[in-house]
A protein has these predicted regions:
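Axial heme c-ligation environment in periplasmic c-type cytochrome domains
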Residues: 47-56, 72-110
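Soluble non-cytosolic domains of exported or imported proteins
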Residues: 26, 63, 86-90
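The canonical Cys-X-X-Cys-His
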Residues: 33-42, 95
Length: 110
C-alpha cells in the first residue's frame, strides 16, 4: 500500500514537469524561427560559412552546452550582435536549449 502515494507523487511531478518542458521546446523553436532562422536556416550560417550551429562547429568554438549558446544569443559573438532584447526574459535560455537539442540531432527534423 505504501507504493500508491509514491506513484501518485511521481505521476504528479511528471504532469507538472512535462507540459513546461514541451512549452519551453515550443517557445525555443518559435524564438529561433522569429529571430535566428533568417541567418541560420537548419543550423547553417548564410553570413559566415563554417560558423554554423552544427555540433562540430559549436564545439570547435567552445560552445559545448546550452548555457554557452545562451550567452552568445544574449551577448553576441564576432559579427553577430546580441539578441537579449529581442528574445525577452529567459528567451536566450529557451532558444539555446532548442538549438543544443537540434545540434545533438544533427538538425534532422522529426
Amino acid at each position: 500500500m505504501s507504493m500508491i502515494p509514491l506513484l501518485s507523487s511521481v505521476l504528479l511531478a511528471l504532469m507538472l514537469f512535462l507540459p513546461s518542458t514541451a512549452l519551453a521546446v515550443e517557445t525555443g523553436a518559435s524564438l529561433f524561427q522569429n529571430n535566428c532562422a533568417s541567418c541560420h536556416p537548419n543550423g547553417e550560417n548564410i553570413i559566415r560559412r563554417g560558423r554554423t550551429l552544427k555540433m562540430k562547429a559549436l564545439t570547435k568554438r567552445g560552445l559545448d552546452s546550452s548555457e554557452a549558446i545562451a550567452q552568445v544569443a544574449r551577448e553576441g559573438i564576432g559579427q553577430m550582435s546580441g539578441y537579449a532584447d529581442a528574445l525577452g526574459e529567459d528567451g536566450d535560455v529557451f532558444v539555446a536549449e532548442w538549438v543544443w537539442q537540434q545540434a545533438q540531432k544533427a538538425w534532422t527534423q522529426g
